[in-house]
């Protein structure tokens, strides 16, 4: 189970294939996914809340392509379809929101040795940027990024003063397939992955 960012709700997996949310005040439960996008009964799937509590990213089986999972995005209100963010045809998993909710970090075997015979796959760490502004900022050269920081220093000071307010996650689905970035220089047998808050450093076990 995972608490929502504001601590008012609790997400959990029911019967190993459905994502559900319990409102801790009203005790009402709402369904986020209906179970049709996860066929395994071996232990559930990975998912994560967005920082604003309005979205989930999750592993799911898209296009009835079991056992290969994709990375999805779905409304936390329980009234939306899962958006397939990867459509790779190969296994992707372990999604988490990073960079203040502007991107999703995940691992995939789309570039490494693939499990065509159900063994021997290698992984890479990836980012999918949810909006163009975050992608453009990430793509800046070191010199351009320093200029960007200098030009926006006053704006950052104002934002730091109001840091207690949670910003809404901006989701722009148009051309999102062009905002997927490979972070690791080579594929490996990966464990967990983390990225620093400023997006400069990737940590992973391999």
Which role fits each region the language model picked out?
Residues 184-206:
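Beta-strand-rich domains and repeat architectures in extracellular enzymes and scaffolds
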Residues 168-187:
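A short helix->beta-strand "capping" segment at the edge of beta-propeller domains
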Residues 8-24, 34-42, 54, 59-72, ...:
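A flexible loop/linker signature enriched in serine peptidases of the S9 family
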Residues 1-9, 47-56, 95-104, 193-201:
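Blade-terminus and WD-like Trp-Asp/Gly-His loop motifs, strongest in beta-propeller folds
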Residues 30, 99-102, 181:
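Solvent-exposed, polar/charged alpha-helical surfaces in well-ordered, non-transmembrane soluble domains
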Residues 45, 82-96, 181-191:
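Conserved blade-ending motifs and adjacent loop-strand segments that build the rim/top face
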């Amino acid at each position: 189970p995972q608490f929502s960012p504001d601590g008012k709700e609790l997400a959990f997996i029911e019967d190993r294939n459905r994502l559900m949310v319990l409102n801790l005040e009203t005790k009402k439960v709402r369904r986020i996914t209906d179970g049709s996008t996860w066929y395994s009964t071996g232990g559930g799937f990975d998912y994560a809340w967005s920082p604003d509590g309005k979205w989930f990213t999750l592993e799911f089986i898209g296009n009835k392509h079991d056992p290969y999972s994709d990375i999805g995005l779905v409304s936390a209100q329980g009234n939306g379809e899962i958006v397939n963010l990867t459509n790779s045809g190969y296994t992707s998993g372990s999604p988490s929101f990073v960079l203040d909710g502007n991107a999703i970090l995940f691992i995939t075997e789309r570039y490494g040795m693939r499990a065509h015979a159900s063994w021997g796959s290698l992984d890479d760490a990836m980012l999918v940027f949810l909006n163009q502004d975050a992608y453009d900022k990430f793509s800046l050269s070191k010199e351009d990024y320093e200029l960007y920081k200098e030009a926006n220093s006053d704006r950052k000071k104002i934002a730091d003063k109001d840091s207690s307010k949670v910003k809404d996650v901006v989701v722009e689905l148009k051309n999102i397939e062009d905002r997927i970035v490979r972070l690791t220089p080579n594929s490996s047998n990966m464990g967990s992955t983390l990225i620093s808050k400023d997006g400069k450093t990737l940590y992973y076990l391999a």
